[in-house]
Amino acid sequence: MAMLGKRRPPRTANERVRRERGSATRRDDATADGLSIERLAHDGRGVARDPHGKTVFVDQALPGERVRVAVHRQRKRFDEAHVVERLATSPERATPPCAYYGRCGGCDLQHLDLEAQREHKRRTLDELFTRQGLTLPEIEVLAGEGLAYRRRARLGVKCDAEGTPHLGFRARGSEHLIDIDSCVVLEPVLSRLIAPLRACLVQLEAPRRVGHIELIATAEGACVVVRQLREVPGDEARWRRFAAEHDVTLAWRVGREAPTLRWLHAPRGEALHVTLVLDDTTLSLGCVPGDFLQINADVNARLVRTALAWLAPRGEERVLDLFAGVGNFTLALAPRVASITGIEGSPAMVERLADNARRAGLHQVGAQQSDLATQVPEVAAVDWVIMDPPRGGAEALCRALADSPVTTLLYVSCDPAALARDAARLVQGGYRIQRAALADMFPHTAHLESMLLLTRDTPRGRSTSVEREDHGQGP
């Protein structure tokens, strides 16, 4: 978001590095012969030890490489460093496909071969479960293209001292903006809008009133959502012209405290749609800007298809889909089971889930609103539970499920550490991990999506609606 009131030009990544490193940067004579990179940390940085045994995290260094480094941040237990000279190069090193890589903070693994990235993520998932005393079965890797995969992104906007607007992504670990003209991981329909959007910002009466710009690729084409901190009538007309000229849908999200969505160039029915391609059908999911959508449409479809294959429904199961969103798993599973109820915290998304089910003719779908951070739903009459919680996981839900009669659980997670923690609680409750998958939803980053199938033969007990003891806190 724009930092209002700051009267200075946005720093480039190089300026930021010089400022941060400044007096903190040092070259130890003891490391003149270089450090050997032993492994990758979970966040993708190389891990070495200096001659004194202190751990050093090295940006963009790979296992097997020997590097001379400069330390730019010293901590009590470890140092953080960057490469000054590479003395030996890993065969897994790749040429980054992006001209902005190393400055832009959007990607952090473009210097590593794509297959090696996936192996690193597989090891990360396995290590996190080992720390919990758990052994995973063979991890299936679900992967698609490495570039042009991202169907949603948020671009920062900032004006310099002269009032010139800049558009791009933040530098890694910083609020400083990296100006870009394109992005190789965005779907092309979105990437080619970046330069025209910057040109439009330059023409605005009040570009400082734009906080950020969100881009979404939908069945209707590209959608642009402008975070407008305050209405500017003249700029509204300019954005309308931009939408018409570039054949995009466009909305303002206006206001500071509780911004409202207002369409300036609306899709038919003021609803967008994304498609979910399954083996035997293609589903259309209605959504609006702000609804949760998986970033990678192709890998999301692979994830859902894998879930259906693992579960192998016979048409008689009663299913609960928690954190259901607009129906990603709910609608895919509905024709194959006796009944399925999607539960979601957002009332608006619950309405869209119900509408999506009606449009698809799926009468066995129920949609309910519930704050799953504070309330565990009734599961006594349920055979299967599916859940795809936010990054913090679902610790309270897993405690309740461990003592419930549910025998089959499909758990999708965007945080492998939270998944490992929750899986340990479920295993204590008698579940067994039957299948595991890594979904490479975010190629060229250290982020990973994962999925488990857990089953047990004998239920632990009867379940009722259970209030969390720490009422009011998130999962």
Swiss-Prot record:
Positions contributing to S-adenosyl-L-methionine binding: 294, 323, 328, 344, 371, 388
Family matches, as Gene3D superfamilies: 2.40.50.1070, Nucleic acid-binding proteins (2.40.50.140), Vaccinia Virus protein VP39 (3.40.50.150)
Enzyme category, top tier: transferase
TRAM domain boundaries: 26-85
Binding positions for [4Fe-4S] cluster per the UniProt entry: 98, 104, 107, 183
Entries under InterPro entries matching the protein: 23S_rRNA_MeTrfase_RlmD (IPR001566), NA-bd_OB-fold (IPR012340), SAM-dependent_MTases_sf (IPR029063), TRAM_dom (IPR002792), U5_MeTrfase_fam (IPR010280)
CDD domains: AdoMet_MTases
Source taxon at top rank: Bacteria
Ranges annotated as biased composition (Basic and acidic residues): 13-30, 457-475
A matching Pfam family: tRNA_U5-meth_tr
Active site: 414
Start and end residues of each stretch annotated as Disordered: 1-33, 455-475
Ranges of Basic residues composition bias in the record: 1-10
EC number: 2.1.1.190
Disulfide bridge partners, by residue number: none
One BP annotation, GO: rRNA base methylation
Family designation: Belongs to the class I-like SAM-binding methyltransferase superfamily. RNA M5U methyltransferase family. RlmD subfamily.
Role played: Catalyzes the formation of 5-methyl-uridine at position 1939 (m5U1939) in 23S rRNA.
Protein name: 23S rRNA (uracil(1939)-C(5))-methyltransferase RlmD
Organism: Chromohalobacter salexigens (strain ATCC BAA-138 / DSM 3043 / CIP 106854 / NCIMB 13768 / 1H11)
